[in-house]
Amino acid sequence: MPEKIRQQVPSEDQLYDLAELFKVFGDSTRIWILYRLFSGEYGVNELAESLNLTQSAVSHQLKLLKQARLVRARREGKSMIYALADDHVSTMIGQGLEHIAE
């Protein structure tokens, strides 16, 4: 474990926030959406079609992912375009995949 992490004692609020973040990863549909966003920005309809899900289901999951700050959105005309919030998201998923492969 890195020394920096060992020296820091997380507050109760930080532990709660971390638990809430990990809850978001507890749904395979959300993982699929994040994984799809690895390759770029997409609108809700594009994501729904590529994942064989309804637009409503994808919108609901994107709302949760946005609240968790894992995705960001921007308006393009009448549509919202979604992308990963930052590189941390792909790093977390990649490390999770490495962990389960061990």
Language model region names:
Residues 13-56, 69, 76, 80-87:
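N-terminal helix-turn-helix DNA-binding core of bacterial DNA-binding proteins
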Residues 63-101:
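Charged, amphipathic alpha-helical coiled-coil/dimerization segments
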Residues 1-17, 88-102:
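Amphipathic alpha-helical dimerization/coiled-coil segments
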Residues 4-5, 34-35, 63-64, 82:
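Short amphipathic alpha-helical surface micro-motifs
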